[in-house]
């Protein structure tokens, strides 16, 4: 998770302790989505705690994600290089891929190798929140593609920006 699907920017210093353990409840929640409109409002109630960052990890990200009823994890996408792994902790989510849909409950997991052109995302179609761990490596030069939406990410001297597929910025 190197930020191709950015979230709101917040400054966070990991707690200074003698041990490398972190209480997830002490890690600030990032709510909402970094997508531009009209995509942002489609995400619903999504909260993410960047546990890997809180532990000082730099080569891969680990996020504790909570999806409220009706929320989705992201727009359906695939990565050119980033491997992604998800492990469901509570509730039920529906994994939507190019091949269809599959319900995942507690203890189930899914993985997406980088470069595999199988766009995916999760939707919480249940009546209660669902939580899962999301793990992804951080590879410079990774890009994400969104087959269902007019969205791409670009990068210039000012950082990452959202654009239409024809290059016009949002």
Residue ranges, per PLM feature:
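Short, conserved beta-strand element in jelly-roll/cupin
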Residues: 64-68, 79-96, 135-137
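Short, charged/polar surface micro-motifs in flexible loops or helix N-caps
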Residues: 68-72, 92, 101, 116-117, ...
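Conserved short histidine dyad/triad with adjacent acidic residue
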Residues: 45-48, 63-79, 117
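Short strand-coil-strand connectors
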Residues: 58, 96-100
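A short, N-terminal "cap"/entry segment at the start of jelly-roll beta-barrel domains
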Residues: 3, 7-59, 144-170
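Short acidic-glycine-tyrosine-enriched beta hairpin
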Residues: 99-114
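Ligand-binding loop in jelly-roll beta-barrel domains
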Residues: 56, 114-142
């Amino acid at each position: 998770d190197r930020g191709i699907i950015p979230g709101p920017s917040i400054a966070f210093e990991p707690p200074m302790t003698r041990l490398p353990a972190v209480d997830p409840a002490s890690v600030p929640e990032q709510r909402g989505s970094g997508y531009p409109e009209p995509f942002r409002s489609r995400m619903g109630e999504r909260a993410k705690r960047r546990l890997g960052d809180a532990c000082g990890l730099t080569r891969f990200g680990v996020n504790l994600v909570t999806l409220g009823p009706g929320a989705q994890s992201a727009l359906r996408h695939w990565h050119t290089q980033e491997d992604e792994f998800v492990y469901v902790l509570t509730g039920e989510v529906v994994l939507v891929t190019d091949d269809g849909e599959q319900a995942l409950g507690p203890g189930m997991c899914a993985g997406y190798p980088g470069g595999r052109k199988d766009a995916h995302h999760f939707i919480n179609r249940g009546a209660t929140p669902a939580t899962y761990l999301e793990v992804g490596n951080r590879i410079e030069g990774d890009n994400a593609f969104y087959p269902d939406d007019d969205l791409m990410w670009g990068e210039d001297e000012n950082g990452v920006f959202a654009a239409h597929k024809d290059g016009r910025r949002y």
